[in-house]
Amino acid sequence: MDVSSDKYEKIVDLAARRGFFWPSYEIYGGLAGFYDLGPLGSLLKENIRKLWLDYFVFRHQDMVVLIETPVIAPEIVFKASGHVESFTDPIVTCSKCGKIYRADHLLEDILGIKVEGLRPEELTSIIREKGVKCPSCGGELEDVRTFNLLFQTNVGPYKHDVAYLRPEAAQGMFTSFKRVFNAMRYSLPLGIAQVGRVARNEISPRQGMVRLREFTIMEVEFFFDPEDTEEPDFSRFPEKLRILTADARSKGLDEVVVVRPEEAVAEGIVLNKWLAYWMSVAQAFAKELGLREDEILFEEKLPEERAHYSKQTFDQLVSISRWGWVEISGHAYRTDYDLSRHMQFSGEDMTVYRELKKPKEVTKKSVVIDQELLKEYFGSDTPRVLQALRRLSVEEVEKILSEGEVIVDGFKVPARVFRIEEVKEVVRGRRFIPHVVEPSFGAERLLLVVLDKAYYEEGGRVVLKLPPKLAPYKLAVFPLIPKEESLRTLARRIYHDAVKAGLTVIYDEDGSIGRRYARVDEIGVPFAVTVDYQSLEDNTVTVRFRDSREQIRIKSDEVIKWVLNNL
């Protein structure tokens, strides 16, 4: 077992033993892709959520709001979004034992080649050419086919009321866009954020907490005018990004570009300024989770790897034990895909109107229909034909003029009934469908990353060097001699004051002081206060720092203020 695998096993053992996480339904043998969060894991995840909200919502209150939408949505929502058709992975079945594998992962594991994004027939060809067999029994593999990852259910007792568990929070934000836009006084840019549960029926979830069938997603759908020239305030998060471009990847190169976000836009590396901006926010957020800059990389997805809705996607990768580089967030430029599709499927207007700073005169093409000539051709059918013709666009009429005629509702209409005129008009505003960029994070995966970066072994003891903001418990309070009632009384008073102040705090009087320090070091408590005999003389207590083990003395009535100032 290599060092990184050994570290990972130790983290998993610690997580189960001390109450961070463990496989769900263990007493029945577990269920792949599902994990429970214990008392410490729940607190750690909540602190990650709060930090994410701070970066992506509360620091952007002038343009980002928080909403909540259901986990279940009717089938039409996911038909419109493209998930019913496109949210699939390739699978292959053994013709002998019947075992099913995710085809691209199988080939990557056996052949060591990257095949993500290849079509089923291309994967089948590789299986045949390389003679890949079933790893379990050696049997022949069938042709590769697609498997939809949506969890299907029914709403109420009727089987025809098909619905799905959402695989992303995004669609609830898209379908609610006009409501939120109106509530926020028709302002763009507008970010709609959501934190909630999602489900993906993964074929063969692996890598523990890295790939789950149910997890908490944290997303922003950021709506903006694609013609708006106003720049994001890049100075708020000015650090450089490490980017591996799709161009480099397509050439088999691993040369990383280090560039400021605004420079990445200017040089055409990132297609949209808001995409670059939210990538810079994501980098700052990741560093506060305990990651170094050299451990963070934005990898641009190749065209065949991108989701059906994306014009450009970057995965934010971080390096962790055993699994190497793993994705902690995805950053997609979804353009107007989602709003356009929901507009098409629902019939609701998803456009917005913006007044121009200065009205301008424009020349537009307009279709004119010669109604008198139309009557000569169609007589009493003229109203019906006219109604159909009025639905034609300028582009469609231009095509008719070049072809000579068109058949509409069964009537052959000659081109001579049309003409196109240019008219001048004063435009005071424009109507358009907003574009969207999306930063999206998985909370449980972040939890694993945070534990991986915080885990240290020092002098035979385990220390979780969690950032104090993220630590499940901020403070531990110990009476040095538990049997001494006066020490216990002061320690309990400090404990209760800490609870009243909103701190998560542990009170422990079991065992030696060394054992108590070791127990709280192992779960990442950053500060420990010990009440000793000197405390009774001068009203001071010892504060011990988890990472350095250094100790200082402060007044007992200043403990709460001191802890709050050092988080």
Label for each model-derived stretch:
Residues 1-567:
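NTP/phosphate- and nucleic-acid-binding module
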